Curated annotation (Swiss-Prot):
Task performed by this protein: Facilitates the functional incorporation of the urease nickel metallocenter. This process requires GTP hydrolysis, probably effectuated by UreG.
Matching HAMAP family: UreG
NCBIfam families, A to Z: ureG (TIGR00101)
Binding annotation for GTP: 24-31
Molecular function via GO: GTP binding; GTPase activity; nickel cation binding
Main location: cytoplasm
UniProt-listed SUPFAM superfamilies: P-loop containing nucleoside triphosphate hydrolases
Intracellular or extracellular location(s): Cytoplasm
Superkingdom, natural source: Bacteria
Cellular component per GO, a single term: cytoplasm
This protein's name: Urease accessory protein UreG
UniProt keyword GTP-binding, yes or no: yes
Length: 215
């Protein structure tokens, strides 16, 4: 595995760091999405990442082993309690982590913040995240989009992951797409198979467009 460069290519126009929150249930593919985004964007943008786990720093370890970013650019946060509390009701532990990473890497273009696995009601505090991406997976059943909840209805981008599993779990992707449109209105969504990189480019395009990132 080739280690990523410690000093990525720089943008010609400097903008304030964009904070991108990635949330979703346990096992939906949040860490995989973060890994794919880091690997695809690290040569263009200066990236740092913060992961949340309740009692461990497992996601930080996984990203480091995968070579998503240099080890010093990934920070693990142990929340010690409900994951949604650390990203919304009392986001102080993550706000402090963001400040620490930006003090180390003041030229960072994007700060990714991955929440711990949580339910459909989890949302990011606007003080912590500029853009929110919520990840669900097909294996949870085709009914998930119509269950609603802030993660489904209010996130800036909904990612419906593991589309390759639809035939195995009896999920109809057309039904999921229809229900998603009903629940989200004009808010965008992307269907992905992250292991095959399907849909990753669409997520990146969304981040660049909505985050006003120009190279």
């Amino acid at each position: 595995m080739n280690a990523p460069a410690s000093s990525p290519a720089r943008r010609t126009k400097k903008l304030p760091p964009l904070r991108v929150g990635i949330g979703g249930p346990v096992g939906s593919g949040k860490t995989t999405l973060l890994e794919m985004l880091c690997k695809a964007m690290r040569d263009t943008y200066d990236l740092v990442a913060i992961t949340n786990d309740i009692y461990t720093k497992e996601d930080q370890r996984l990203l480091t082993v995968a070579g998503a970013l240099p080890e010093e650019r990934i920070m693990g946060v142990e929340t010690g309690g409900c994951p949604h509390t650390a990203i919304r009701e009392d986001a102080s532990i993550n706000l402090e982590a963001v400040d620490r990473m930006l003090s180390r890497f003041p030229d960072a273009d994007i700060v990714f913040i991955e929440s711990g696995g949580d339910n459909l009601a989890a949302t990011f505090s606007p003080e912590l995240s500029d853009l929110t991406i919520y990840v669900i997976d097909v294996a949870g059943g085709e009914k998930i989009p119509r269950k609603g909840g802030p993660g489904i209805t209010k996130s800036d981008l909904l990612v419906i992951n593991k589309t390759d599993l639809a035939p195995l779990v009896g999920a109809n992707l057309d039904v999921m797409a229809s229900d998603t449109k009903k629940m989200r209105g004009e808010r965008p969504y992307v269907m992905t198979n992250l292991k095959a990189l399907d849909g990753v480019a669409d997520v990146i395009a969304f981040i660049e467009k909505k985050g006003l990132l120009t190279v």
